[in-house]
Curated annotation (Swiss-Prot):
Organism of this sequence: Methanococcus maripaludis (strain C7 / ATCC BAA-1331)
Xref: HAMAP family: RfcS (MF_01509)
Protein's job: Part of the RFC clamp loader complex which loads the PCNA sliding clamp onto DNA.
Assembly and oligomerization: Heteromultimer composed of small subunits (RfcS) and large subunits (RfcL).
Pfam families in UniProt: AAA (PF00004), RCF1-5-like_lid (PF21960), Rep_fac_C (PF08542)
Taxonomy of the source species: Archaea, Methanobacteriati, Methanobacteriota, Methanomada group, Methanococci
Name of the protein described by the UniProt record: Replication factor C small subunit
Superkingdom per UniProt: Archaea
Gene3D superfamilies: 1.10.8.60, 1.20.272.10, P-loop containing nucleotide triphosphate hydrolases
Coiled-coil regions, chain positions: none
């Protein structure tokens, strides 16, 4: 069975990692000196945190990286027992070969409970001579200050468009795909700097056709084209409520889009609308209120219809 492309084309060394040049430079220095502090990687999903941690381990240990590297996903194993058993058992044993220390990688560490984080802090202190911890998280504010203060913090930003484009073209060439300009632009739009999402969308589109077009990308990603969102929004702003609501229903039924997805796309379109700054402020406020109501469990169609109605009377 064919591997997912995100694994097939995952960088194996730090030099292969796409983007984040300053971060990679600092990590490479750690490898060269065979010395590093505990690390905290923060950033949104799909921007390279796990890839950087794996590449760091492979560069540090070479062929013995599996014996000296432990990866745990904290969202699955988030309790204090994991810290007391798996983490402590691995941390207390000496490194294999000539490695100066072992590395424990805790993915999604912001999912750890408060008790588990306090136990982790004590473990980090106790075994710091033979073990280093690399923590990754989406929300660093959920990591307790005592752990943050013990780590060198690396903030991974969403990948730049040129980095995404270069990688997508390289993968397309290896997979014998024709990647149209519109297809690239569509993948960039739906992925929002998330390389994992971009590669997954490309692979899904490739299963439909060897020529990746704009239409195919939006269809497999269950996203509306920006011009469709803009058309619906513009109709509402012009007071054509019934027509804009019809466009909304088409998106939800024909494209199978959730209300939350449509709302996010409307929000992304606000800066491009031909309305005053004051009206944009009121519109964003209305979008925020709509989002809150949907999250609380209100009917998506009713709330989005109400938002479109409000657009027609913006002041």
């Amino acid at each position: 069975m064919q591997k997912p492309w995100v694994e097939k084309y995952r960088p194996q060394t730090l030099s292969e990692v796409v983007g984040h040049h300053e971060i990679i430079k600092r990590l490479t220095n750690y490898v060269e000196k065979k010395s590093m502090p505990h690390l905290l990687f923060s950033g949104s999903p799909g921007v390279g945190k796990t890839t950087a941690a794996l590449a760091l381990a492979k560069d540090l240990y070479g062929e013995t990286w599996r014996e000296n590297f432990l990866e745990l996903n904290s969202s699955d194993e988030r309790g204090i027992d994991v810290i007391r058993t798996k983490v402590k058992d691995f941390a207390r044993t000496k490194p294999i070969g000539d490695a100066p220390f072992k590395v424990i990688f805790l993915d999604e560490s912001d999912a750890l409970t408060s008790d588990a984080q306090n136990a982790l802090r004590r473990t980090m202190e106790k075994y710091s001579d033979i073990c280093r911890f690399v923590l990754s998280c989406n929300y660093p504010s959920k990591i307790i200050p005592p752990i943050q203060s013990r780590c060198a913090i690396f903030r991974f930003s969403p990948l730049k468009t040129e980095d995404l484009v270069e990688n997508l073209k390289e993968i397309s060439e290896k997979e014998n795909l024709t990647l149209e300009k519109g297809g690239i632009d569509a993948i960039i739009y739906v992925s929002e700097g998330d390389m994992r999402k971009a590669i997954n969308v490309l692979q899904t589109a490739a299963a439909v056709s060897d020529t990746v077009t704009e239409e195919i990308v939006y269809k497999v990603a269950s996203k509306a084209r920006p011009d469709e969102i803009k058309k619906m929004t513009q109709l509402a702003l012009n007071g054509k409520f019934v027509e804009s609501r019809e466009q909304l229903y088409n998106l939800m039924i024909d494209w199978g889009m959730s209300g939350e997805d449509i709302l996010i796309q409307i929000f992304r379109e606000v800066p491009n609308l031909d309305i005053s700054e004051k009206e944009k402020v009121h519109l964003v406020e209305a979008i925020g209120e709509c989002d809150f109501r949907i999250v609380e469990g209100s009917n998506e169609r009713i709330q989005l219809s109400a938002l479109l109605a409000k657009m027609g009377i913006l002041e």
